[in-house]
Amino acid sequence: RWVKNQMVEAGRNRANSIGFPDAYAFTKAMSEQAVEETRSQIPLTIVRPSIIESSWKSPTSGWIRGFRMAEPIILNFGKGTLKEFPGIPEGIIDIIPVDLVSSAIIACAAQEPSSDTTIYQVASGSCNPIRISKLADYVHKFFGENPIYDEKNQPIAPAKWRFPGRGRVESQLRRAQGLLGQAEQTLTKLPIRGRQAMIVADIQNRKDEIDKALEYVTLYGKYVECEALYSVDNLLTLWDSLSEEDKSVFLFDPRSIDWYEYVYNIHLPTVITKGRVKTSPSKSSAKSRSSRLRSQVLDSQRQLAVFDLENTLIASNVVSSWS
């Protein structure tokens, strides 16, 4: 695992050093160059989408396969885990619904082949931009009106993002990570019983949440700080060349997107459904099965000693003891 993490970090640093936000974008650029150099006389058309999110209209509004970039960030914001995220408030988050991308690919494939490489960028930032601050406002409003409920059956109030620098957010998360780690180490050296055991479990849960938040900031922070705009002139020229009949079937004009309608009424409900989060108070106040089992195991009235009599796991025959 250590070797894998070091290789990932090396790839990320290499990509950053030549202007790419991560190794993913870097390898896509390398792939384009490789295809261009080896295509010989084969016609080549490259379609470059920006950040792909759920569908605008087809096959149904909100269709998406798996989670993309924004969904984990949105869910953790709704859960109260991610209270801050870096970014430039007036910056542009360049997202595009998946059905516009698929329609553009079909339209490109139907064109007469050219001897030159043709590039179509399927993006929204240069012709129908949505500001990061506006997207954050939509998300804040949505979770204010449709809150996620916690384990105690209480609605989670969404935080208001202030968009500090990425370095500041990472420092805050790493500091919290360190403090929780120290608390965990201290408590695990003491006999675990009753309320103390529940505190240890809560610290571990919180530590896991901080780890995830830090991962999202590290992975996606550069995307929301990027101020690049991608020209869609070729895409719009292709769109204008279509018949009205084709336009009604293969929609890929980014200017047609109503961002409030898309984000608030289509994408965010999809994220909630896919995330399977609790969006209403439970009818019963009973504890969850996992909470009941944990309480039973950690009951202060219980005593447990575990022995490794065959001496197969560790050198000592007493693994742990509670009394």
Question: What spans do the regions from the language model cover?
Answer:
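First extracellular/luminal loop
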Residues: 1-19, 246-268
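NAD(P)-dependent short-chain dehydrogenase/reductase
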Residues: 1-12, 16-25, 29-112, 135-143
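Short, solvent-exposed loop/turn segments at secondary-structure junctions
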Residues: 51-53, 126-128, 320
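Residue-level signal for the nucleotide or nucleotide-sugar donor/cofactor binding architecture
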Residues: 93-96, 130, 230
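C-terminal capping/lid region of NAD(P)-dependent oxidoreductase domains
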Residues: 262-287
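Short, basic/aromatic recognition patches
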Residues: 289-296
